[in-house]
């Protein structure tokens, strides 16, 4: 549809605008090394690109800026992968180098690091715990009255909580109970644990622990964990540093949406596998109509576990963000396989 010359001019306009946030005129383009056409030719091609809807005028400048259609064409047809700096690759890989892979900790740190590397808002939707399977459970005494119950799932999710240990339960009973739980419950989906414990495990415990009723109370406290996905944000206020959002009235609804968090559950929960780019009004939420959302899913085999997303202005560094998300999802997937 577009000529080679138009493709080059469109890509140069978008690349320049992404970097400068300033409308791009023919004089700016004429100074670019890769543009060898006359100013008159550049103006004619820009007029054609505007007529086709790929670029548009602003009220305050004679230059042009990319339209949503222009950004979509750029992402679909002109984008080239960006090679990330080695120090950033090392920083990201170091995050996933720990031998014990705690999914919750990784999700929190991923959101923070991505927000720092991009200066956009990063969102990580963790796995839905109800679809996880129990890997093992530990109960670690802190003193005579309290202990920490630690639940580890097959996806690396670690859930810990402090529980009360009745005086009537001795440490040997606690150890027996943990051994029985790991023997009988390893591999059981988290959503089925409650039924399995109170229909099967309690019967087994009767023959092994002295104070049966107190042991049941410990069990009940240990496995009361939220099963829905957790969502983590990094750089919630980063949008305010973008020139497009210096008008607080313009960005107020977006900041409210980010602060409330809940709307992003529905947005991220149903993402298709792989990298997805939503630009401007392609986003379902009206508060995001001046934003782009780039998301990537991570999984083990056929099982999709979670989503990482970057929210920024439509003038986003698409190539860099996509390269970062691809690296993060590879690292998370590899970490979950450990």
From Swiss-Prot:
Iron is among the record's keywords: no
Keywords: Repressor, Stress response, Transcription, Transcription regulation
GO MF entries: DNA binding
InterPro entries: GAF-like_dom_sf, HrcA, HrcA_C, WH-like_DNA-bd_sf, WH_DNA-bd_sf, WHTH_transcript_rep_HrcA_IDD
Pfam family, one: HrcA
GO biological process: negative regulation of DNA-templated transcription
Family note: Belongs to the HrcA family.
Role, per record: Negative regulator of class I heat shock genes (grpE-dnaK-dnaJ and groELS operons). Prevents heat-shock induction of these operons.
UniProt-recorded name of the protein: Heat-inducible transcription repressor HrcA
Taxonomic source organism: Bacillus cereus (strain AH187)
């Amino acid at each position: 549809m577009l000529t080679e010359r138009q493709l080059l001019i469109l890509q140069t306009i978008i690349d320049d605008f992404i970097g400068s946030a300033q409308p791009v005129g023919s004089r700016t383009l004429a100074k670019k090394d890769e543009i060898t056409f006359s100013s008159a030719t550049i103006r004619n091609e820009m007029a054609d690109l505007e007529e086709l809807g790929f670029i548009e005028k602003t009220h305050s400048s004679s230059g042009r800026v990319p339209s949503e259609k222009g950004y979509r064409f750029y992402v679909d047809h002109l984008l080239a992968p960006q090679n990330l700096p080695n120090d950033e690759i090392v920083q990201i890989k170091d995050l996933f180098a720990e031998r014990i892979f705690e999914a919750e900790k990784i999700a929190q740190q991923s959101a923070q690091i991505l927000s720092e590397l991009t200066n956009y808002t990063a969102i990580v939707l963790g796995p839905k715990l109800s679809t996880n399977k129990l890997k093992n459970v530990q109960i670690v005494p802190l003193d005579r009255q309290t202990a920490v119950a630690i639940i580890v799932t097959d996806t690396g999710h670690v859930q810990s909580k402090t529980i009360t240990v009745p005086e009537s339960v001795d440490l040997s009973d606690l150890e027996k109970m943990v051994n029985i739980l790991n023997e009988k419950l390893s591999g059981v989906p988290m959503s089925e644990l409650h039924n399995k414990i109170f229909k099967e495990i309690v019967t087994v415990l009767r023959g092994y622990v002295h104070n049966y009723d107190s042991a049941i109370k410990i069990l009940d406290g240990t496995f009361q964990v939220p099963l829905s996905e957790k969502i983590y944000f990094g750089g919630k206020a980063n949008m305010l540093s973008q020139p497009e959002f210096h008008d607080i009235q313009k960005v107020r609804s977006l900041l409210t949406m980010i602060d409330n968090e809940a709307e992003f559950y529905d947005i991220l929960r149903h993402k298709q596998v792989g990298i997805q780019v939503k630009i401007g009004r392609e986003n379902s939420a009206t508060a995001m109509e001046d934003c782009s959302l780039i998301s990537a899913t991570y999984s083990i085999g056929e099982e999709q576990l979670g989503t990482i997303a970057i929210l920024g202005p439509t003038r986003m560094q698409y190539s860099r963000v996509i390269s970062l998300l691809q690296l993060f999802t590879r690292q998370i997937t590899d970490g979950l396989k450990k």
